[in-house]
Amino acid sequence: MKKRHLLIAGLACMTILGACNNDDAGSSGQAVVEVDGHEISDAEFVDMLKERYGEAILQELVQRHLISQAADSVEIPQEEIDEELETFKSQIGVETDDEMLDALSNQFGITVENKEEFVNEYILPPLVLEKLAVEGVEITDEEKQAYFDENRDSLIEVEASHILVEDEETAEEVLDRLEAGDDFAELASEYSVDPSAEANNGDLGFFGKGDMVPEFEEAAFNMEIDEVSEPVESTYGYHIILVTDRKDSYEELEEKIHDTLMRERSRTQEEVLRDLLAQADINVLDDQFEGLFDLPDAPPVEDTPEIDGEDASDEAEDQAEDADENAEEEDES
């Protein structure tokens, strides 16, 4: 989701901020580097950072403060926080908290004391924005039922596993072994050329229409539960498909419908931030950043010419007369 992009962007931005936030920067004139006898001071270094990246960093700091204030009115379940933390670890290729803290320091130049500090600074803000985005949005049972009735066919989901092989001969060999009673998951691990098969034994989980290549989708959505397909050819090779479950009732799809309607009706995170900025009292004290937080004025509403009842009648009569005259001219011609 977008919040994950926001998290990575925030880390990158705060990497720059770390250089600007040095306790001695800009005050002592201490040299950062010496080149052929010429010293480049930390003041020069920070001034250039401010010139080039100052607006982005200042916006980030203000936004983080506003989100922190707004967090007081938002309740986020611990399981959501834990899920986001695990997702972030996966994104940067680590498993433990210590590995994550090391990666933050080595990859992003971010030093935090512990996991809790990282969660408060980087995991919570996107979650707060997400909660604010759906604030006040309500979906009724009647609306969900109506959406289901109108979009039933496109909402259906199928759960399936597959064994992908390169040629039809191998596919027939796999089918023979399945008919002989061999286990589908074990055969997927043995035969499938799908890179994910080693980890998931061919299990694709639930998917909807449009998620798979057309040939695969056509076969899977027309199969019964526990049915095994004949070889299905696609651009990837030959698939042996096993359908294991299906969601096609309102009760099974209600959560998906609810999430879809929430996404359609909620504000974007950009809109949430814009609203927070509009409500805040921001006084820019540095001339370099004057106007940075000014919000664009709403476009003026164009006045619609008013026609009172009498004028409207006159105009209608004129149009009718013009139409009659045109008709008479056509008859004469």
Curated annotation (Swiss-Prot):
EC identifiers of the protein: 5.2.1.8
Gene Ontology BP annotations: protein folding
Residues with lipid group (N-palmitoyl cysteine): C20
Signal peptide residue numbers: 1-19
GO molecular function terms noted in the UniProt entry: peptidyl-prolyl cis-trans isomerase activity
Protein name per UniProt: Foldase protein PrsA
Record-stated family: Belongs to the PrsA family.
Database matches in PANTHER family: FOLDASE PROTEIN PRSA, PEPTIDYLPROLYL ISOMERASE
Catalyzed chemical reaction(s): [protein]-peptidylproline (omega=180) = [protein]-peptidylproline (omega=0)
InterPro entries: Foldase_PrsA, PPIase_dom_sf, PPIase_PpiC, PrsA_foldase, Trigger_fact/SurA_dom_sf
Region (Disordered): 291-333
Ranges annotated as biased composition (Acidic residues): 303-333
GO cellular component labels: plasma membrane
Domain of life the protein comes from: Bacteria
Enzyme class: isomerase
Job description of the protein: Plays a major role in protein secretion by helping the post-translocational extracellular folding of several secreted proteins.
